[in-house]
Amino acid sequence: MKGDQTIIDVLNDVLTAELTTINQYFLAARMLKQWGFDRLAVYYRKESIDEMKHAERLIDRILFLEGLPNVQRMNKIMIGENVEEQLKLDLDGELVAVKRLNDGVQTCRDLRDNGTETLLREILVSEEEHVDWLETQLDLVGRLGATAYLAEQLKE
């Protein structure tokens, strides 16, 4: 089915962000494991895999619309030098993703592409859940202090 190029561009923009986030979260998971924070490492690895599933669905939709998925383009990967900085950088990135997805949903509405709108809404819900998790973690760091928070992250 031939899709609107504007929609394909939106999908490729979201795909670029997802591909970047896969790598960012995978590297963060490995760093967290190296630092001994196994609980956070497991969470980040799972999130990396979730982002990969989003990318897969985006690629499938682009191909369905007879577009070409751009898997060569990536944004800058943002890695923190400590856990709190990583959480903050990830929250910043997820907030940008939520805005991008909301804008994409609106574009889909304007161009009457309900199938792509549904896909972007589903990814949006996942990203909003991750925003909530990151905000909670940063709140815990603030209330407990970094040392107590990190002590809770040592074991799965």
Regions found by a protein language model. Give the residues of each.
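Iron-associated oxidoreductase/ferritin-like identity signal
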Residues: 1-156
